[in-house]
Amino acid sequence: MKILVLAVVCTVLLQVALSADSEEVRDCIPTRHECTNNQQNCCEGHDCKCDYTEIGGAKKEICYCKKTLWQKTKDKLSTAGDILKS
C-alpha cells in the first residue's frame, strides 16, 4: 500500500513539474522577436542579440532573439538525419 501511495505522489509531482515547464516554454520570446526589455526570456536555444541604431541623433538599442550556433547545428543535423532516414 505504501508503494502505491508513493507512486501516486511521484506521478502527481511529475505532472506538476512538467506543466510548469510547458508554461515557461509558452511564455518565452520566439526567434526574431524583440527582446529589448526582457533579454533573459528568449526561448531555449536562443540568445538575445542587440544592435545599436542612430535615430534622430540619439543611439537606440534594439534587441531580438536569435538561435545560438549550437541550436542551428542541432537543427541542421536533425534535418539531415530525417532526409537520410527517408
Swiss-Prot record:
Domain free text: The presence of a 'disulfide through disulfide knot' structurally defines this protein as a knottin. The C-terminal part (65-85) forms an alpha-helix which probably disrupts target membranes.
Q: Could you tell me which cysteines form disulfide bridges? A: C28-C43, C35-C48, C42-C65, C50-C63
Species per Swiss-Prot/TrEMBL record: Lachesana tarabaevi
Provide the free-text tissue specificity comment from this protein's UniProt record. Answer: Expressed by the venom gland.
- Where's it found, cell-wise? Secreted
User: Which UniProt keyword terms apply here?
Assistant: Disulfide bond, Knottin, Secreted, Signal, Toxin
Return the InterPro entries for the record: Spider_toxin_CSTX_knottin (IPR019553)
Where in the sequence is the signal peptide annotated?
1-19
Q: Give the protein's function.
A: Insect toxin.
Q: What is its main location?
A: secreted
* Pfam families, alphabetized: Toxin_35 (PF10530)
UniProt similarity note: Belongs to the neurotoxin 19 (CSTX) family.
In the UniProt record, which is one GO cellular component term?
extracellular region
Q: How is it modified after translation?
A: Contains 4 disulfide bonds.
| Protein name per its UniProtKB record | Latartoxin-1b
Coordinates of motif Processing quadruplet motif in the sequence?
A: 23-26
Indicate whether Signal appears among the record's keywords: yes
User: What GO terms are given for molecular function?
Assistant: toxin activity
Excised during maturation, the propeptide residues are 20-26
